[in-house]
UniProtKB/Swiss-Prot annotation:
Organism: Mycobacterium tuberculosis (strain ATCC 25177 / H37Ra)
Gene3D superfamilies, sorted: Ribosomal protein L9, C-terminal domain, Ribosomal protein L9, N-terminal domain
Listed name of the protein: Large ribosomal subunit protein bL9
Record has Secreted as a keyword: no
rRNA-binding listed as a keyword: yes
Pfam family, one: Ribosomal_L9_C
Coiled coil (UniProt feature): none
């Protein structure tokens, strides 16, 4: 059975790909779940248009991610004032992704989603310089230098 995928399917293909599958797999799994449509000339044209649109969107997203990367790198090290214990210098709590996003925004950087900030495996619980990764695009990550300082 020849089908055109309408969603990414593991070990089979991505949106717009024309695939040949066994009849039972197509009829009982892919078609009822809306993961594929039966291949025809009209459906193939539609799939080609979707694929072209996705490729142009990917290029636009990559360009936008490069612009954001340049803006973040231009900021340099970002200061993040936090409340600390007076005697030990340890933080009350830890630095979160939302704190990092707010610090970038306050430093004059772009507004980011906290879900794209990748904190180190060990929590940031001490004053000092820490490095945080920002995942802008599947091909682009930005390393941000974060200076955690005691709030005065």
């Amino acid at each position: 059975m020849k089908l055109i995928l309408t969603a990414d399917v593991d070990h089979l293909g991505s949106i717009g790909d024309t695939v040949e599958v066994k009849d039972g797999y197509g009829r009982n799994f892919l078609l009822p779940r809306g993961l594929a449509i039966v291949a025809s000339r009209g459906a193939q044209k539609q799939a080609d248009e979707i694929r072209r649109a996705r490729e142009t969107k990917s290029v636009r997203d990559l360009e936008h991610a490069n612009e954001i990367k340049a803006a973040i790198e231009a900021l340099g090290p970002i200061a993040l004032p936090v409340k600390t214990s007076a005697d030990s210098g340890k933080l009350f709590g830890s630095v979160t992704a939302a704190d990092v996003v707010a610090a970038i925004k306050k430093a004059g950087g772009p507004n980011l989603d906290k879900r794209i900030v990748r904190l180190p495996k060990t929590h940031i619980k001490a004053v000092g310089t820490h490095f945080v990764s920002v995942h802008l695009h599947p091909e682009i990550d930005v390393e941000v230098s974060l200076d955690v300082v005691a709030q005065s």
